[in-house]
From Swiss-Prot:
Protein name: Dihydroorotate dehydrogenase (quinone)
Source species of the chain: Yersinia pestis
Presence of keyword Protein biosynthesis: no
Entry EC no(s): 1.3.5.2
Assembly notes: Monomer.
Spans through the membrane: none
Catalytic activity: (S)-dihydroorotate + a quinone = orotate + a quinol
Keyword line: Cell membrane, Flavoprotein, FMN, Membrane, Oxidoreductase, Pyrimidine biosynthesis
Main location group: membrane
Enzyme active site: S175 (nucleophile)
Residues reported to bind FMN: A62, G63, L64, D65, K66, T86, N139, N172, K217, T245, G268, G297, Y318, S319
InterPro entries referenced in this protein's UniProt entry, alphabetically: Aldolase_TIM, DHO_dehydrogenase, Dihydroorotate_DH_1_2, Dihydroorotate_DH_2, Dihydroorotate_DH_cat, Dihydroorotate_DH_CS
Length: 336
């Protein structure tokens, strides 16, 4: 497989520069006859989830294609679903660089990107141009300069705009890189947000005559009590799914490694066990009342099976995709 050679070259570069270079090349082939250069044949293994039919259970997690620039090229690699974003109502540059770090020895990444994106309107134009045959999820967040108390308005603005174009909508309230965002996961703030989102979903369902499911993405850094409360809120508000988990602030598994002290969210293999534990506990609490999309450190067939055994109906990859390449998609779908 060619990817080890590509990876070796890319890993000589700054991580964000490598990402930009890769996406520049993918944009050139996306939606063109040159897509065959990245296409691979992946078995069809249909999964029904959130009322949708997925051609296979392996998806791309949000954060890689924030602006939906390479949907078709990524789709050609065999993903059953792709989640673009996180996107915000207005464009924003994100946090200062450098803001992305490879923990190569641990096959992890630390990012403090800060929802850098070109805004929801730009994303929609890119989605309109795409021809991806799988399910497209759109992940939404709030702008950094929107006060947390008014944060729900940003989610509602985004929902209003993306609803006709989304297969499902992911509500990101768990990024550690937007100040105050994670506070929306708790108590009255969560109930208030979920009630508003559910009302908006009902309104948009009637307006567009189609039902677009909503999933909420949660953090791994939750106590058992917090997890139980979140599960209860999701069920009470009839949310359609939960994505577990986002990146972690915990550094216990990468102590002493290069960049371990960098601020931001840690993903990849060091997150694997904790995210699986959260999925397992969530599954016990939810008792099948809403499905779980499992994400966090999936870099092998074994890791994917562990997520599904813990209770995930679908899985997503990101860091594992960076470290292992497109072959990981085919490998998991074939052997899961």
């Amino acid at each position: 497989m060619y990817y080890p050679l590509v990876r070796k070259a890319l890993f000589q570069l700054d991580p964000e520069r490598a990402h930009e270079l890769t996406f520049r090349q993918l944009k050139r082939v996306s939606g063109t006859p040159l897509e065959f250069l990245v296409r691979q044949s992946v078995p069809t293994k249909p999964v029904s989830c959130m009322g949708l039919s997925f051609k296979n259970p392996v998806g791309l997690a949000a954060g890689l294609d924030k602006d939906g620039e390479c949907i078709d090229a990524l789709g050609a690699m065999g993903f059953g679903f792709i989640e673009v974003g996180t996107v915000t109502p207005r464009p924003q540059v994100g946090n200062d660089k450098p803001r992305l770090f490879r923990i190569v020895e641990a096959e992890g990444l630390i990012n403090r990107m800060g929802f850098n994106n070109h805004g929801v309107d730009n994303l929609i134009e890119n989605v309109k141009k795409s021809h991806f045959g799988g399910i497209l999820g759109i992940n939404i967040g709030k702008n950094k300069d929107t006060p947390v108390e008014q944060g729900k308005e940003d989610y509602l603005i985004c929902m209003d705009k993306i609803y006709p174009y989304a297969g499902y909508i992911a509500i990101n309230i768990s990024s550690p890189n937007t100040p105050g965002l994670r506070s929306l996961q708790y108590g009255e703030a969560l109930d208030d947000l979920l009630a508003a989102i559910k009302d908006k979903q009902t309104e948009l369902h009637q307006r567009h005559h189609k039902y677009v499911p909503v999933a909420v993405k949660i953090a791994p850094d939750l106590t058992e009590e917090e997890l139980i409360q979140i599960a209860d809120s999701l069920v009470r508000h009839n949310i359609d799914g939960v994505i577990a988990t986002n990146t972690t602030l915990d550094r216990s598994l990468i102590q002493g490694l290069n960049y371990c002290e960098q601020a931001g969210g840690l993903s990849g293999r060091p997150l694997q066990l904790r995210s699986t534990e959260v999925i397992h506990r969530l599954s016990q609490e939810l008792k099948g009342r809403l499905p779980i999309i499992g994400v966090g450190g999936i870099d092998s067939v074994t890791a994917a099976r562990e997520k599904m055994a813990a209770g995930a109906s679908l899985i997503q990859i990101y860091s594992g995709f960076i470290f292992r390449g497109p072959g990981l998609i085919k490998n998991i779908v074939t052997h899961i």
